[in-house]
Amino acid sequence: MSGGKQHNAVSIPVNREQRSFEKQRRDLLTGLEHGGGAHRGNSIAPYTEDWPSTVDNWIDSSWKRWDDDMRRLRRGMFALLPLDTFSIGILENPFALMHQMDRQIQDIRERMGSLDVPSTGSVNDFLKDAYEVGEDGKVHFKVRFDAQGFAPQDINVTSSENRVTVHAKKETTTDGRKCSREFCRMVQLPKSIDDSQLKCRMTDDGVLMLEAPVKVDQNQSLTLNESGQVAVRPKSDNQIKAVPASQALVAKGVHGLSYVDDGSGGKRLHVEVAVDPVYKPEDLFVNVDSNRVVVSGRHHKQKSDQHGRSSSFAEFSQSYAIPETVDPLSVSAQVVGNTLVLEAPLEKQHAITH
């Protein structure tokens, strides 16, 4: 036996939900709306001081865009693919299998010319929407699989080495003869989640939901943008003082996108954006949208004097195309003088040769 580190697969029980996916979603929003979650407490203060109001706004927006959100969530579900379409050599290499699965779904989408075909599930496609408020009012990692036609006992879910595998077996009987087919899907897990707490549920209309809490640095400030995506706020002056010098970001004086060495043979994304002094750290947001990193700011100021009340509003948004995406929760951002500096490790794509 090899002396290398072994990555044993951990089985994740599939629990049956006695409700539909839509009902589960409604119950989530209603529970948070009625104060059932912990987002009003002090247990998640490290996110931001205004996190409770951020969650309240997200709940209101989710109700208003209900139909659009349900379509988006269903389009983003992972499809289970038949294993008999893949070669044995591919099956023995998990990263090659994930790559091949992505290509197969993309080919189907291109042939059909439809966005209604389930997402490729590649890093570029799903991480931007993989974080959402959970029942406890905190940010959770959530992915969903279209498992219609399967029962919970037909599905085996395992996690190993930063990936999760959904394996399903389906038996049919035609003219007295039994036929069995196996389906599978692998998804690479981001390092920002607590994979020891992965939970799996299956709704009564065939949606398999995988969920886990996230690990957030105590000095990291999370918020939600207008689309409900998780965004990172730059560290405040007090937070920067608490950061070790080795982790402090440095402005290089080159505005825009560049790359820096990460010290271990890889590359980190480095972006510098000049910001007007009117913007404070709490006015700025960084989020990831597919293969783009987006920096935006919004400042609203009200003033009262003997002539009455007046208000001013300023905003900006800049985006930068990147060759590979990043995990939104891996972004580190600081304001250095009048420059917003952000860095994040690139999600490594495993090259496949053919």
Curated annotation (Swiss-Prot):
Name of one Pfam family that matches: HSP20
Domain sHSP per the UniProt entry, residue ranges: 122-233, 251-354
InterPro entries in the cross-refs: A-crystallin/Hsp20_dom (IPR002068), Alpha-crystallin/sHSP_animal (IPR001436), HSP20-like_chaperone (IPR008978)
CDD domains: metazoan_ACD
Statement: the UniProt record of this protein carries the keyword Membrane: no
Region (Disordered): 1-21
A biological-process GO annotation: response to heat
Keyword Repeat in record: yes
Residues spanning the membrane: none
Record keywords, A-Z: Repeat
A GO molecular-function annotation: unfolded protein binding
Coiled-coil spans in chain: none
Cellular-component GO terms for this entry: cytoplasm; nucleus
Matches recorded under PANTHER family: HEAT SHOCK PROTEIN HSP-12.2-RELATED, RE23625P
Entry's family note: Belongs to the small heat shock protein (HSP20) family.
Protein name: Major egg antigen
Organism: Schistosoma mansoni (Blood fluke)
